[in-house]
Amino acid sequence: RLKEYPFQKGDNLHENLRRIIRDILPEYEAYPYKIVGITIGIYGVVQQNQILFTPYYPLPDFNLAKLLESEFHIPVFVENESNLSVLGESAFHHYDQNMVLLNIHDGIGMGIMINGHLYRGQDGYAGEIGHTILFPDGKPCPCGNHGCLEQYASEKAILEEYARLTHQEQVTIDAFVRDYQNQVPEALEMMELFSKYISI
């Protein structure tokens, strides 16, 4: 069951997660095993259940998994959302031992599975494809570099550039897709650019 819990800028992450978990727990009391574990997916780098780096929002430096485990007495796992996506695809859809999954949203992430095992690389950075530098003197990125792929080919970057090209304050993904399907020249141009950047 999917349920949304909107977060506002400046919200206390730990308090919000505690509230969400407290809200969900009673729903599973009647089940034989109740809740056997909690997984938290984040946009960022995770190693050994510890958040190392998040480019788009600051996360507290405490051990989130341990804090929640000690309070709720349930195993808590923190993982990069692209890694979770490739695990989900492998487990529930394709059953492949070797696969790569691209996640494109505000950033660009990659989940990598080799011989049935998640591949994280050194310090968990293997899937951070969005921070491949396309243009060394390009747009600044929250990671601290300039010209990263996700500053040009992420959903966020495409919509911002399309809004600029079409003199709009903001464009939704639905509006962009509609314009592309209707062959609006600027939308076609943006998709051409996206295809070029993402295939480099």
What are these regions (language model features)?
Residues 97-152:
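Glycine-rich phosphate-binding loop of actin/hexokinase-like ATP-binding domains
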Residues 5, 52-56, 146, 178-179, ...:
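Conserved short-loop catalytic and cofactor-binding motifs
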Residues 2-26, 30-98:
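Glycine-rich phosphate-binding loop and adjoining helix at the ATP-binding site
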Residues 9-31, 149-152, 157-200:
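Adenine-nucleotide phosphate-binding core of ATP-dependent small-molecule kinases
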